[in-house]
């Protein structure tokens, strides 16, 4: 997941701000739900890097390892992964990267306007020469249509939410056929999988953490699964993945 700092650095972060669920300020105080949101787009990266986002315990993700972490730069994370896989003699990593732009009254204030958001992120990603190992995903249909027009070489994945249940309705919002559809796992059924495959679209549901749900999706013959628990996914797919 990509966000942008005040000084236009590309930061790996799910949230556009420091979430009260996990963030600790440089002075050691924890970010609380009642506090004003501290948006990354209003802060230079050297300030962002002083916040800790790893050492607090989590009730949302049981088993989370507690250790000091920062929100890294995307360039550093990608370079580190490329170096690691080469050093270990592993197959090169494939990347499914989300650009977190969205509509809203604070667009252009607390996060960038979508053209700028896309252009800055794609400039970085293309500089890494990842080729067909890169898929860019997004909920924002404005951004997806723009990326398809300006960067036709990209593989794009269309993220849809838990209330998006009609295939024809949400697909009609795009000006093109995406390489991937990424629906909320709860909306995935045999019909949607069949429609995707008939249209030549791969399907990758998000975010399945329950082992029974992971198995249900496997049995539906989805093409990939997004999960917070890769160990559970690997265990469930041991007999399916070569």
Task: Show which residues each predicted segment covers.
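Conserved metal-phosphate-binding beta-hairpin within the catalytic cores
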Residues: 2-3, 97
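Acidic helix-start/capping segments at beta-turn-to-alpha-helix junctions
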Residues: 4-9
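Catalytic metal-binding/acid-base residues of hydrolase active sites
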Residues: 3, 17, 231
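C-terminal active-site rim and adjoining tail of enzyme catalytic domains
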Residues: 154-242
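Metal-dependent phosphodiesterase/phospholipase catalytic core, i.e.
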Residues: 14-141, 145, 149-155, 176-177, ...
């Amino acid at each position: 997941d990509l966000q942008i700092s005040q000084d236009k650095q590309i930061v790996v972060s799910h949230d556009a701000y420091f979430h009260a669920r996990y963030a600790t300020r440089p002075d050691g105080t924890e970010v609380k739900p009642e506090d004003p949101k501290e948006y990354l787009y209003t802060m230079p990266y050297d300030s962002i890097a002083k916040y800790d986002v790893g050492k607090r315990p989590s009730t949302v993700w049981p088993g989370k390892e507690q250790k000091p972490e920062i929100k890294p730069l995307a360039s550093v994370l990608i370079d580190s992964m490329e170096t690691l896989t080469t050093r270990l003699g592993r197959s090169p990593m494939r990347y499914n990267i989300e650009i977190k732009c969205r509509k809203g009254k604070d667009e252009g204030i607390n996060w960038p306007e979508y053209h700028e958001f896309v252009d800055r992120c794609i400039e970085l990603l293309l500089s890494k020469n990842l080729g067909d190992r890169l898929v860019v995903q997004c909920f924002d249909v404005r951004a997806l249509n723009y990326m398809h027009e300006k960067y036709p070489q990209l593989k794009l994945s269309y993220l849809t939410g838990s209330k998006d249940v009609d295939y024809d309705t949400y697909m009609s919002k795009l000006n093109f056929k995406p390489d991937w559809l990424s629906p909320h796992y709860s909306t995935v059924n045999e019909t949607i999988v069949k429609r995707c495959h008939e249209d030549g679209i791969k399907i990758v549901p998000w975010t399945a953490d329950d082992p029974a749900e992971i198995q249900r999706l496997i049995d539906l013959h989805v093409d990939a699964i997004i999960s917070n628990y890769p160990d559970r996914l690997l265990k469930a797919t041991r007999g399916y993945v070569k």
